[in-house]
Regions:
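Basic nucleic-acid-binding interfaces
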Residues: 2-38, 50-75
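Active-site beta-strand termini and strand-to-loop segments that position acidic
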Residues: 44-48
């Protein structure tokens, strides 16, 4: 597995090539915990109640989700 720092760098450089597992790994590292799965989306929540959904059905997630994650982790 790649380190979280490498994944975040990849998210900044190439936001359209991030897998759902990589996104989940980054969210876990920054304090988000897997909450539930509903349909084709996984839901992560942090201790402040901030929620981030990540689609799991496609091999890569759309850039809009990557931008949301980067914004929420402060990058």
């Amino acid at each position: 597995m790649a380190s979280v720092k490498k994944i975040v760098d990849k998210m900044k450089r190439q936001p359209n090539g991030i897998s759902p597992d990589e996104a989940g790994q980054v969210l876990d590292h920054y304090g988000y915990k897997f909450d539930r799965q509903s349909g084709s989306h996984k839901t992560y929540i942090n201790k402040n109640g901030d929620v981030q959904t990540v689609p799991k059905k496609r091999p890569t997630i759309k850039p809009v989700y990557v931008k949301q994650i980067l914004s929420k982790i402060g990058e």
